[in-house]
Amino acid sequence: RKWGHPDGVAILLNTKYTKKVYFALRVCAQGGKETLSAEKACIWPVAEEREIKMLQLEHLAWQLPGGESILKGVDMHVPKGKLVVVTGPNGGGKTSLAKLVAGLETPTAGRILFDGEDITGLDITQRARKGIAYAFQQPVRFKGLRVKDLLSLAAGKNTSVNEACSYLSEVGLCARDYIDREVNASLSGGELKRIEIAMVLARGTKLSIFDEPEAGIDLWSFQNLIRVFEKMYEQTKGCILIISHQERILNIADTIVVIKNGQVARTGSRADLLPALLGSADAANPACDVLTSKIEGV
């Protein structure tokens, strides 16, 4: 009946090791019991449910003006509504990847597709209008602007100042203490980092990119940050891309991508890949945060 058949009940069959094919079978009621009548059963194909790729990178490459290759043909995707963590050794190309997706750099080869559209040639402002937000690894200090100015700009003209500043509490900052403060040298790196994350929250974008969000913040703030990402993940209709090698961030990922020497070394679900990175004993230990030495061996 769900597919328009007046007499039947739909049953979905999924082949596990071949291409997914679904069939709807008409089940006929006979003698008060539901049985399958071979001569009366109707079999017809039903459309396959497909994973929607919000972000897709195709053969992405980037090199410095001097000719040094940083990224060498990266292929990966971020599904809609998922949280993907990119990890790997220092200097492997993680931050470069984030900058290319955000529009801060232009790839020397390959394509970037966002929500089905080729955005390779768009700059960071144009991509922001498409729904991409980027939180820098090193936060930017905006002279002459107050915290509430930044949050209001991020949230847009249809959002009140009070509503925009409510996002400060989400990242563990008291709005009353910070709302009128100027974004200058009086703010620590950790405070700036949290303000920048609050700006991303205020925007409510389709794709949120965070480059090592744990850098420069204390343990309490980091624990609060994990709760922020978990809440974003539960509420977002888009997706989240995080650059990190902290175990507690990897532990909330749907997918982990390991970038090494400018290429995708491994990719997989958290359940499949995290034990391989940590070793089964370390994977159960939430106090073990630094993965760099493990990742180097991937």
PLM segments and residue spans:
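ABC ATPase NBD coupling module
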Residues: D118-A133, L277
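Q-loop/switch helix immediately C-terminal to the Walker
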Residues: Q138, G144-E163
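Helix-to-loop junction immediately C-terminal to a conserved catalytic motif
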Residues: A102
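Conserved structural motif at the start of ABC-family nucleotide-binding domains
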Residues: L55-L57, I70-G73
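Conserved ABC transporter NBD signature motif
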Residues: G110-E117, E163
